[in-house]
Amino acid sequence: MAAYKLELSNQAERVIRRMAEREPALYQRVAGALDDLRRDPHQGKPLKGELRGRYSYRVGSYRIVYLVRRQELLVLVIDIGHRRDIYR
């Protein structure tokens, strides 16, 4: 299976930068998870309702919400956040 290209939304980039500065251990775990998603983007949980078509991937109590564009071999990370806030 070919590796997918990973692209971050502006929101996801802001979260990653802030996380790298304030919570380096969590940043390392999220960076590892993003690499896993690049290799196999379908390991996340498909979302329902208004978020249909998107996936969620768990990193402890944090979630990575993303889209998979199979035609382009692209994983588009929409947002990263704590599970209590991410789906709002």
Where are these regions (language model features)?
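Basic, Lys/Arg-enriched alpha-helical interface segments
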Residues: 1-61, 69-74, 78-80, 85-88
